[in-house]
């Protein structure tokens, strides 16, 4: 999946796993692995000595499926923000469906997401990995987000605002200023959750509502 940050990549992949579960009538696993936060040991596992064989083996991470009859999705997010060592470990899973000799069960699918090339702090992927994937540009329209928001308990006031100001759903195109707060689909949902929890809708505490808006979706929107 190719998309801007905060567009809901992990949410839509998790939703797919839930739909698979309904279709199969059995449990379907879902693991969201944020590669930008991983070291190589977080992928390969921790080394330990197999006393019986005298060979060093790797203890697999919690997310590695061990049931051969299981189904699920391994979701590697922020693939193009991972370190080179982490990428090499992920390559083996993505290309060979194996990790240190352990086979990924046939019922599991591997999905990865990358942040758009126009965002900062991303690396160019090796062509050997790039051409092994089916690529999807994930860019739902603002109205598609509005439809999704209506079905996912997003505050009505937020939905109506985006319906009138569709250009303010996402951060602006181009280089973003470090340290500055911009709107994103993820931050709009977080803003919605916060104002509902604090009871700020139709509240006389308009100053507090403005401050919360600044913190989640940026100063420019907060003063509108």
Show where each model-derived region lies.
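Alpha-helical lid/collar subdomain of P-loop NTPases
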Residues: 152-224
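AAA+ P-loop NTPase catalytic core and its hallmark functional loops
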Residues: 1-164
């Amino acid at each position: 999946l190719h998309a801007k940050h905060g567009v809901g990549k992990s949410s839509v992949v998790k939703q797919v796993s839930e739909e698979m579960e309904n279709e199969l009538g059995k449990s379907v696993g879902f693991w969201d692995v944020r590669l930008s936060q991983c070291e190589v040991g977080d992928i390969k596992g921790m080394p330990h000595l197999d006393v019986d064989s005298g060979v060093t083996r790797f203890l697999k991470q919690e997310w590695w499926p061990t049931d051969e009859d299981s189904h699920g999705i391994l979701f590697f997010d922020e693939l193009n923000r991972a370190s080179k060592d982490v990428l090499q470990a992920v390559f083996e899973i993505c290309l060979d469906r194996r990790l240190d000799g352990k086979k990924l069960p046939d019922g599991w699918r591997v999905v990865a997401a990358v942040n758009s090339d126009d965002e900062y702090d991303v690396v160019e992927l090796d062509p050997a990995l790039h051409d092994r994937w089916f690529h999807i540009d994930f860019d739902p329209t603002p109205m598609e987000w509005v439809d999704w928001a209506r079905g996912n308990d997003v505050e009505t006031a937020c939905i109506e605002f985006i319906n009138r100001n569709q250009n303010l759903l996402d951060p602006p195109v181009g280089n973003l200023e470090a340290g500055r707060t911009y709107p994103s689909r993820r931050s709009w949902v977080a803003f919605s959750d916060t104002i509902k929890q604090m009871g700020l809708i139709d509240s006389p505490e308009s100053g507090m509502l403005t401050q919360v808006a600044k913190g989640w979706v940026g100063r420019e929107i907060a003063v509108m």
